[in-house]
């Protein structure tokens, strides 16, 4: 059975979690600390006696802030740190029960699907060495069929046996060495490969679960069957490894452990929750549906049973983190019951010019570093001066102030426009060094920034 430690909560301390988030996200320390504490509380709860553990409920978080300030990025990075089943969903994907669209219980099903997939991959990693040996033997069997030896003069199928000779063993050892050195990757072999019956079934919105069950039912029809296929060794190896791993992995244990992990350590991030909030000054049928989504979310967040194809999960101890810009609405416009289920509220700050400068230089995978590495593949050395970084940050900030504020996403637009010509010409400029300074930035973007109409459509 999968180890109990595979999906336990992350053992990182809040300080370590914040330090890890700092490597990728600039600022927003309050949000980082709240998320870090919530994540650590998952671990703390698992250390309690079982009777008390069941009484400790997660403190759900509501993150409030304009677009492009890091809400979604915090969720994305959290997924890699959590060491637990994690799913991110858009609130706008769901509709009230009775309307066309996905119902909120799909969140629970998605969480279990994620956990099962992760557990299955972990189980396959544990048997990787063993299945690679099995796959190697099957490839060698295809390359060197064993000689059939009959007993007596009348050869009967029942008395034929496979008898490797010393010469065969030497040949097999030689081919094994060639196989491991990669000399036979393009050699074609014939194999019996398991048949995977798959059907593409189109289902109406909101009935994806039924379509998935139908696909699974039809796939089971061909279970156990195999067919002969001619493949190169390079193409055959991953197929054989997957096939052998499936034989060694216990699906029942994986499903049971995945459901347990979801119930005890699952984390759900609900983005764009402000889009399902009814505005106080509007009246209309669409707002009824939005409020209905909130009411459908309520039992899920409070704690309910959700039926999935792997079994029923209880959502009582799942941590929910919701986020939204709340441009046209306020968190107080959420239905009161749902407000009470998100006791921790965190406001993320709008980004300043100084933040943009840090975003361009500090993160491990800063945008400037990404462009430098991309152009390096073409043999072009790209360098950004400090005054160039300052000017790029200033332009992004000014355009955000003048138009819609889209936060750090504006930097993507500005940099792409700035380096468009260089990216186009880079295959013909192998070996060159290009320095981007303030003059370079002004030459390529200055006119666009001065003309509000142009910047509105281009930047």
Curated annotation (Swiss-Prot):
<dbReference type="InterPro" id="IPR004491">
    <property type="entry name" value="HslU"/>
</dbReference>
<feature type="binding site">
    <location>
        <position position="271"/>
    </location>
    <ligand>
        <name>ATP</name>
    </ligand>
</feature>
<feature type="binding site">
    <location>
        <position position="409"/>
    </location>
    <ligand>
        <name>ATP</name>
    </ligand>
</feature>
<dbReference type="GO" id="GO:0051603">
    <property type="term" value="P:proteolysis involved in protein catabolic process"/>
</dbReference>
<comment type="subunit">
    <text>A double ring-shaped homohexamer of HslV is capped on each side by a ring-shaped HslU homohexamer. The assembly of the HslU/HslV complex is dependent on binding of ATP.</text>
</comment>
<dbReference type="GO" id="GO:0008233">
    <property type="term" value="F:peptidase activity"/>
</dbReference>
<dbReference type="InterPro" id="IPR003959">
    <property type="entry name" value="ATPase_AAA_core"/>
</dbReference>
<protein>
    <recommendedName>
        <fullName>ATP-dependent protease ATPase subunit HslU</fullName>
    </recommendedName>
</protein>
<keyword id="KW-0143">Chaperone</keyword>
<keyword id="KW-0547">Nucleotide-binding</keyword>
<dbReference type="Pfam" id="PF10431">
    <property type="entry name" value="ClpB_D2-small"/>
</dbReference>
<keyword id="KW-0963">Cytoplasm</keyword>
<dbReference type="Pfam" id="PF00004">
    <property type="entry name" value="AAA"/>
</dbReference>
<dbReference type="InterPro" id="IPR050052">
    <property type="entry name" value="ATP-dep_Clp_protease_ClpX"/>
</dbReference>
<dbReference type="InterPro" id="IPR027417">
    <property type="entry name" value="P-loop_NTPase"/>
</dbReference>
<keyword id="KW-0346">Stress response</keyword>
<dbReference type="InterPro" id="IPR019489">
    <property type="entry name" value="Clp_ATPase_C"/>
</dbReference>
<dbReference type="GO" id="GO:0043335">
    <property type="term" value="P:protein unfolding"/>
</dbReference>
<feature type="binding site">
    <location>
        <position position="26"/>
    </location>
    <ligand>
        <name>ATP</name>
    </ligand>
</feature>
<dbReference type="GO" id="GO:0009376">
    <property type="term" value="C:HslUV protease complex"/>
</dbReference>
<feature type="binding site">
    <location>
        <begin position="68"/>
        <end position="73"/>
    </location>
    <ligand>
        <name>ATP</name>
    </ligand>
</feature>
<dbReference type="Pfam" id="PF07724">
    <property type="entry name" value="AAA_2"/>
</dbReference>
<dbReference type="GO" id="GO:0005524">
    <property type="term" value="F:ATP binding"/>
</dbReference>
<comment type="function">
    <text>ATPase subunit of a proteasome-like degradation complex; this subunit has chaperone activity. The binding of ATP and its subsequent hydrolysis by HslU are essential for unfolding of protein substrates subsequently hydrolyzed by HslV. HslU recognizes the N-terminal part of its protein substrates and unfolds these before they are guided to HslV for hydrolysis.</text>
</comment>
<dbReference type="GO" id="GO:0036402">
    <property type="term" value="F:proteasome-activating activity"/>
</dbReference>
<comment type="similarity">
    <text>Belongs to the ClpX chaperone family. HslU subfamily.</text>
</comment>
<dbReference type="InterPro" id="IPR003593">
    <property type="entry name" value="AAA+_ATPase"/>
</dbReference>
<feature type="binding site">
    <location>
        <position position="337"/>
    </location>
    <ligand>
        <name>ATP</name>
    </ligand>
</feature>
<dbReference type="GO" id="GO:0016887">
    <property type="term" value="F:ATP hydrolysis activity"/>
</dbReference>
<keyword id="KW-0067">ATP-binding</keyword>
């Amino acid at each position: 059975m999968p180890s109990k430690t595979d999906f336990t909560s992350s053992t990182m301390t809040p300080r370590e979690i914040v330090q890890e988030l700092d490597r990728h996200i600039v600022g927003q320390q309050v949000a980082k600390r709240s998320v870090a504490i919530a994540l650590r509380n998952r671990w703390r709860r698992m250390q309690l006696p079982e009777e008390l553990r069941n009484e400790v409920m997660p403190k759900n978080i509501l993150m409030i802030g304009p677009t492009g300030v890091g809400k979604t990025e915090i969720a994305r990075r959290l997924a890699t740190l959590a060491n637990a089943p994690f799913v991110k969903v858009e609130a706008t994907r769901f509709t009230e029960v009775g309307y066309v669209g996905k119902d909120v219980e799909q969140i629970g099903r998605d969480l279990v699907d994620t956990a099962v997939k992760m557990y299955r991959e972990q189980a396959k990693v544990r048997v990787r060495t063993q299945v690679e040996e099995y796959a190697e033997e099957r490839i060698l069997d295809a390359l060197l069929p064993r000689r059939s030896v009959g007993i007596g003069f009348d050869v009967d199928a029942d008395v034929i046996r496979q008898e490797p000779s010393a010469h065969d063993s030497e040949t097999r050892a030689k081919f094994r060495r060639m196989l491991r050195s990669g000399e036979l990757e393009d050699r074609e072999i014939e194999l019996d490969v398991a048949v995977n019956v798959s059907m593409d079934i189109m289902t109406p919105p909101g009935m994806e679960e039924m379509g998935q069950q139908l696909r699974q039912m039809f796939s089971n029809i061909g279970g156990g069957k195999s067919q002969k296929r001619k493949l190169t060794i390079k193409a055959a190896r991953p197929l054989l490894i997957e096939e052998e791993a499936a034989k060694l992995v216990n699906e029942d244990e994986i499903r049971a452990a995945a459901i347990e992990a979801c119930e005890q350590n699952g984390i759900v991030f609900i983005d764009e929750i402000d889009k399902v909030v009814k505005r106080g000054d509007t009246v209309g049928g669409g707002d009824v549906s939005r409020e209905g989504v909130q009411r459908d979310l309520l039992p899920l967040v409070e704690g309910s049973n959700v039926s999935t194809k792997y079994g029923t999960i209880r959502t009582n101890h799942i941590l929910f983190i919701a986020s939204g810009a709340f441009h046209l609405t306020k968190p107080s416009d959420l239905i009161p019951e749902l407000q009470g289920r998100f006791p921790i509220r965190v406001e993320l700050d709008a980004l300043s010019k100084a933040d943009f400068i840090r975003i361009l230089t500090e993160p491990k995978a800063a945008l400037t570093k990404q462009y430098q590495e991309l152009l390096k593949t073409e043999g072009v050395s790209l360098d950004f001066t400090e005054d160039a970084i300052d000017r790029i940050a200033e332009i992004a900030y000014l355009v955000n102030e003048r138009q819609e504020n889209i936060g750090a996403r504006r930097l993507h637009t500005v940099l792409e426009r700035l380096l468009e010509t260089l990216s186009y010409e880079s295959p013909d400029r192998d070996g060159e060094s290009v320095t981007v300074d303030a003059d370079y930035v002004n030459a390529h973007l200055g006119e666009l920034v001065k003309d509000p109409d142009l910047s509105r459509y281009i930047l």
